[in-house]
């Protein structure tokens, strides 16, 4: 039988691998013999003098491994003709290891020798060892050593290592500034660090805290630098409450007129209109926001069942939840607060319950002007939008309302093009998208496939391409320029199919279906992954959570993590950053 082309190609690859292994084995054997000759001082033509130790070697081997020795032995330098070559300011053990590496291509890098090895490899220009040390240190970077590693990398001209250390410093600044390494930095490095836009913080008060900690660590000697250091704090970004109660009361600030001016400037910023604030720059440029995203689920018909789901470790934690039960309500998250609105018991609930995730506190505000259930809600630019829904037992509504979180006031906006309830609504790139739903909560209420978008700038609605599948009680999430409609039900029953709306193309496309069919789906997205955390099938609820990777179009049923037990729950993504930290603000 003739051998196929694929088999021939595979055979050639195998033969090449075997030949390469044999060559490597022979080379290792030759070098092993040379290393033994070195140890026995056979044919050695140079002795490296390191303090009191004499290390024999062959010039050609050292020159091949090190650009430093190559230049030394091949130019007219004095050492090129000397049998003994003195290496000043070198450690004997480290030089011994580098010479051994030149013969064996093997070296042990560990936490005890890495700094000395890196210094020597850099000085004697042995790039493979330098790379091994850099790779080792990159894996060791943490809050306690990142500043020192950054300084070391700068001194030894290791840009890749410095970049890794600096990225860690910026991303974990709230941990780094509480370490001894930070307190011992010189003024130049602290000033540079506090000026970075890429510092990842919950709020600017943490940058202020870092500056004050550094100044107070050696107050008598650091007093002259106080204005330069505090000038890097962006006081307009600090809350008015923290400025007045904490910053102004700080003795360092009170005793320095220049610093007091900075604080007063920050206070004045809070008195400006949004338009006037936009004209300012520099001191009002935001830092990189620190995030800790979790998915919050509130019990709905079982209010005591409220939990966070952490997508990092797949853990569930309880949320203290005192409010009464609500059927068919909605919830959204904005600026540390979850807003729970709409829904009904026997009658529509007028009150809006609010939960501050950082302070773990509940309070109530006036709810939507038109109390109703089966509505949808989302947040954008400090405003909470509610759409559609139905007053108990009635048809779906065209209604569209807006709550301004700054003025704490409700406003009625232009109605939707289509009446709908039990629909989905998301914010994407500043626009409000509404998809699906039904014309009423009764059996005869037609399920919709229609979609529309609202532009807050022009206060106008525009009809969009309809979904492929009519659906209500579905999940609707926004991920990277795509809006995903997940499950739900049509006029015949539960759905397992999933489709997404391409915002740029104005078209819907089907993707892989869920490994479960549900008439009600409760899902949310963190990063590129959609998590289905609760749902109802008609005769039973979702048992374990489902995950959908939007980049690979793959579903995973996680059999190790139980789903949320309440199918009528409310769901939203929240940022809990700061919830478990020491609170600076009083």
UniProtKB/Swiss-Prot annotation:
Kelch repeats lie at residues 294-336, 337-382, 383-430, 431-481, 483-528, 530-575. Residues 44-111 form the BTB domain. Keywords: Cytoplasm, Kelch repeat, Nucleus, Repeat, Ubl conjugation pathway. GO terms for cellular component: Cul3-RING ubiquitin ligase complex; cytoplasm; cytosol; nucleolus; nucleoplasm; perinuclear region of cytoplasm; plasma membrane. CDD domains: BACK_KLHL7 (cd18447), BTB_POZ_KLHL7 (cd18237). Residues 146-248 form the BACK domain. Its main location: nucleus. Substrate-specific adapter of a BCR (BTB-CUL3-RBX1) E3 ubiquitin ligase complex. The BCR(KLHL7) complex acts by mediating ubiquitination and subsequent degradation of substrate proteins. Probably mediates 'Lys-48'-linked ubiquitination. This is Kelch-like protein 7. It comes from Rattus norvegicus.
